[in-house]
A protein has these predicted regions:
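Formylglycine-dependent sulfatase
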Residues: 1-9, 13-300
C-alpha cells in the first residue's frame, strides 16, 4: 500500500485500499497547496501556529529551504500544474486578458496539466479547493465559459471555487464539477470552506478505494487558507486569544530565532530591516490604518 503526498514537502505514507500502488508500481499521489502562506507560517518552519500534522509529515519527508515561484496566485498555480514557466502556460500575471502571449488570463491549450498527464497514464484524478487558472470564474452565471475549468483540464471530479477568493462561510462561487452550488453553502449554518475542501478530498479518496481499488489516483487539494478574507472558526480564534498581543515586531524576532535554531536559515543571516511604513502594533488602530489608506489613495 502506498501514497505519496506533496505540499511544501514530499513524503510517503499509507492509505486503506491503495492496492493499485503495490500491484502496478504507480503510487497514489496527493498534492496539497496552501494559499498566500508566509515562509514561516507553519510550525516546521518556525511558526507559533500549531500545525502538528504538517510538522510530522515534514519530519518524515523533505523540508525545502530554497524555492522559486511566481509570488502570486495564478502564475504559481500555472507553473505548479503544468511544469512550465507561468508565461509559457499563458498566465504570466493574474487573470485579466492583456491580449499578448503569456498574459491571456487562461492556461493555454499548448500546455498539458498534471491532471491531463496523469489521466493519460491511467490515473483517476480529483480536485478539491481553489482553481484560479481562468478569467472565466463567475460560476453563478449560467453562461460563463467553462472550457478552462478543472473538469475540462483533466480532473474527473471537482469541488471548490473557480476564482481566487471567496467567503469562507458562504462562498458564492462554490462549484461541484461544472455546477454552481453556492446556495448549498449559504443554506448550511455550519459550513466552513476549509473543512469542506478537506471533507471533499477525503470523500473522493474513500469512494475511489471502494469503487476502483485497482486504479491509482491523483488528488489535488488546494486550500484558500490562509488567503484573505481572514475568516476563522470561533474555536480556532479562541485557541490563540492573547498570543498576538505583543504585536508583529516581537513576533518576527521570535520566528527569526526559531528558524535559526531549527536550521532553516543560517545564523549569519540577520533579521531583515523593519519596514518603517508599517505602524507599530500599539499604534495600529482602525483610524490610523484608515488614514494610511487615505494617504496612499491621494498619492496614486
Amino acid at each position: 500500500m502506498g501514497i505519496s503526498v506533496a505540499g511544501m514537502v514530499l513524503w510517503a505514507g499509507t492509505v486503506t485500499g491503495a492496492e493499485a500502488a503495490r500491484s502496478t508500481g504507480r503510487p497514489n499521489l496527493v498534492l496539497i497547496m496552501a494559499d498566500d502562506m508566509g515562509f514561516s507560517d507553519i510550525g516546521c518552519y518556525g511558526s507559533e501556529i500549531k500545525t502538528p500534522n504538517l510538522d510530522k509529515l515534514a519530519g518524515d519527508g523533505v523540508r525545502f529551504r530554497r524555492f522559486y515561484n511566481g509570488a502570486r496566485c495564478c502564475p504559481s498555480r500555472a507553473s505548479l500544474l503544468t511544469g512550465l514557466y507561468a508565461h509559457q502556460a499563458g498566465m504570466g500575471g493574474m487573470e485579466p486578458d492583456r491580449k499578448v502571449p503569456g498574459y491571456r488570463g487562461n492556461i493555454n491549450k499548448q500546455c498539458v496539466t498534471i491532471a491531463e498527464a496523469m489521466k493519460t497514464n491511467g490515473y483517476a484524478t480529483y480536485m478539491s479547493g481553489k482553481w484560479h487558472l481562468t478569467r472565466h470564474a463567475r460560476a453563478w452565471e449560467p453562461e460563463e465559459p467553462k472550457f478552462n475549468w478543472p473538469r475540462q483540464r483533466g480532473f474527473d471530479r471537482f469541488y471548490g471555487i473557480i476564482g481566487g477568493a471567496d467567503d469562507y462561510f458562504a462562498p458564492r462561487g462554490l462549484v461541484r464539477d461544472n455546477t454552481s452550488i453556492g446556495q448549498e453553502a449559504k443554506d448550511d449554518p455550519g459550513y466552513y470552506f476549509t473543512d469542506a475542501v478537506s471533507d471533499s478530498a477525503v470523500g473522493y479518496i474513500n469512494d475511489h478505494c471502494k469503487n476502483s481499488p485497482d486504479k491509482p489516483f491523483f488528488a489535488y487539494v488546494a486550500y484558500t487558507a490562509p488567503h484573505w478574507k481572514l475568516m476563522a472558526l470561533k474555536r480556532d480564534i479562541a485557541k490563540y486569544k492573547g498570543r498576538y498581543d505583543e504585536g508583529w515586531d516581537v513576533l518576527r524576532k521570535e520566528r527569526h530565532e526559531r528558524m535559526i535554531t531549527m536550521g532553516i536559515i543560517d545564523k549569519k543571516w540577520p533579521l531583515s530591516p523593519r519596514d518603517e511604513r508599517v505602524l507599530p502594533w500599539k499604534d495600529a488602530t482602525a483610524s490610523a490604518v484608515g488614514g494610511k489608506v487615505e494617504e496612499a489613495l491621494k498619492i496614486t
